């Protein structure tokens, strides 16, 4: 009895399938080393262009046209707002750094064709993000609160350092470098409220009537002085006018007396000779 034809061994194929050949070829090419065309070895002041070396442009210039067999590199200056700091073979210049005032920045060194701008902090700000010699972001100085003193002022790299006032001292606005001592109460006054590190002692008189009496007395004195002052001034003026008038009249009298001619009256003098004739000395 012969076995059925389906039970026999599979027939042998001497030719491999097409898929197997493709796989072998793929693995062969995948493992093969890849060779790229070698770039020319150029000097430090040259840059490669294809298989040739061209001279680099100076700082502040870019390549406008690469060199040829008979021509050198054509360079042109960088436009405003751009720069190149080194010898280069670049076709475009680099954009200058912008210092944004909204970030508290200002240009500590302006941009030129050969140097990039360097940003620093605006006055009243300190740097919070440092990038080499360039500051990328700044922040405003902290403000000391009332009751604090400025222990150390802010710098371009450090914020303001604040410190609380010790007991018995105060700082009204936080801008003082040293806190002030609070006033001590005397026996005439009493403390209306406890002094804090941010406010001074508040003092009031013991009796409100004393304040009223002083104020009323002062106001009354001022009113009396103002009322009497004009009357006294009038009296002074009258007395002064009368005195001047009297002085003027006296001076006029003296002048008239000096200018008047002298009043001379001639009196005849009769000479009498005593007669002793006929009289004896006994009479």
From Swiss-Prot:
The protein's matches in Pfam families, at most eight in alphabetical order, are given as: TNFR_c6
A Gene Ontology biological process noted in the UniProt record is: negative regulation of T cell proliferation
Summarize what the UniProt record says about post-translational modification. Answer: N-glycosylated.
Which residue ranges traverse the bilayer?
Answer: 203-223
Q: Quote the protein name from its UniProt record.
A: Tumor necrosis factor receptor superfamily member 14
A single GO molecular-function term is: tumor necrosis factor receptor activity
- So what does mutating residue 61 to F actually do? Does not affect cis interactions with BTLA
Glycosylated residues, chain numbering: 110, 173
Q: How does it sit in the membrane?
A: Single-pass type I membrane protein
Keyword set, alphabetical order = Adaptive immunity, Cell membrane, Disulfide bond, Glycoprotein, Host cell receptor for virus entry, Host-virus interaction, Immunity, Innate immunity, Membrane, Phosphoprotein, Receptor, Repeat, Signal, Transmembrane, Transmembrane helix
Where is it localised? Cell membrane
Q: List cellular component terms (GO).
A: external side of plasma membrane; plasma membrane
Cystine pairs annotated here are: 42-53, 54-67, 57-75, 78-93, 96-111, 99-119, 121-138, 127-135
Name the family the entry cites.
Belongs to the tumor necrosis factor receptor superfamily.
Encoding gene per record: TNFRSF14
In which tissues or organs does this protein occur? Widely expressed, with the highest expression in lung, spleen and thymus. Expressed in a subpopulation of B cells and monocytes. Expressed in naive T cells.
Give the protein's function: Receptor for four distinct ligands: The TNF superfamily members TNFSF14/LIGHT and homotrimeric LTA/lymphotoxin-alpha and the immunoglobulin superfamily members BTLA and CD160, altogether defining a complex stimulatory and inhibitory signaling network. Signals via the TRAF2-TRAF3 E3 ligase pathway to promote immune cell survival and differentiation. Participates in bidirectional cell-cell contact signaling between antigen presenting cells and lymphocytes. In response to ligation of TNFSF14/LIGHT, delivers costimulatory signals to T cells, promoting cell proliferation and effector functions. (Microbial infection) Acts as a receptor for Herpes simplex virus 1/HHV-1.
